[in-house]
């Protein structure tokens, strides 16, 4: 039997990080549903094929219909600035945002800059903000240049978000573990 740890989200940014189908989105929806104010859901997915369209529909069905939906594949700071600062913001997901930026021919440096600007705007919000992203660095080294670039760029993006997040949770098999920082003293 597993233990239960209570994690209280403050008004800062929370990063939900984990593998595909790990329960990140379900956790975000649960947290959003318990928020007493308005919730804005920013979706970055693009329905490029029937399978992706089905996945998007399922995610839509899982969310409360009263939530405001923003569909923005290239989500940026100007979009975030237009959101009611008292509304909880859920971004699903950073993984697809980074993929979209790569396919929009953005350089690694431009994507790194995007991460710095977006993370600054997200932590400046008054209401809780949840950013969802995949951890893709735990598997094999991709066998092609694009795969390695994606893994590296997303890893850097996640690091920037995590460094500024009030809370970072790793989600696996529907369970969340809080990630902390370690202070090393070699002596």
What label would you give each PLM region?
Residues 12, 37-38, 85-87, 127-128:
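Short coil/turn segments at beta-strand junctions that form active-site/ligand-binding loops
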